Structures are given as structure tokens and as C-alpha cells.
Amino acid sequence: MLGDVAIFGNFSCGLDEKSRMILPSYTECEKGDRVVFCISDIGEEAIDLYPLFVISDLISRCDELILTSTDETIVMRAKEEKRRICSSALVQANIDVQRRLTVNPLIREILGTDSNKYFCIGENNRIKLFSNEEKFKEYIGHSYIKR
């Protein structure tokens, strides 16, 4: 299942005539897996693709902190994180039997391109999609510098 293991590496992919993207085999996705397209935390023409269960787990952890923590700062941070997660989620989709995922018109509009070519990087439990190769290369450069 997508997200059960760390996803590393980068790849480029195109869309077929029905706006479907084929996920690489190392993402370990299966037919029927539900994923969520979210606005990226970097906010620069990028979309994050998370398994639905990861989003659900993050929200559950935030709820638990809100209910159990006695530290007001932690409660406020958990509320803000939950708000950010819920407001960034855009579209849910299913992965089909041939490992294809439909890229919704809203997602293509947010990525700001009419192109059918996307640049992707796997990061732990998500895939980050870029439509702009320069932004992708810039992000990869910054990612390696951070480590």
C-alpha cells in the first residue's frame, strides 16, 4: 500500500488521454487504494499526494493532542495543524488495477500548466508533484542541502 514504506527517488511521468498518471512500482500502491491530493507545504506550484490513511492518522493525532494535552501551546499547534491539513486537502482519488491515478482538472489548474508532463519526488509517505521542471530541480537542490 502506498505510504506503508518510505518512498524515495524521483521520476517524471506523463498523463494519458484520460488524464491518468501511472505510478512507479516502488510506490507499492494497490488497486483501490485511496489517495488525497493536498496543496503542498512549500506552496510553489506543487501538490502532495498522500494515502488517505496517512491524512486520517495525522488528524487523529491532532485530535488526541487537543483533548489530552495540558500545555496550551501544544493544543494551539495541534489545532493549527489540523486546520492546515483539512484546508489543504483537495481531491480524493482511487488507484486503479493498472496503477493509474486520474489527475483532476482542479489539480492541473493549481499546478498551473496545460502540460501533461509532471516531475515527482517521493518523500517518506507522500509523493510531491511539480509541473515546472525548474521548480522541481530547485526543490531537489534545496532538499539535498537541508540534509
Segments (PLM) and residue ranges:
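Flexible "stalk/tail and boundary" regions
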Residues: 1-13, 17-18, 26-98, 105-147
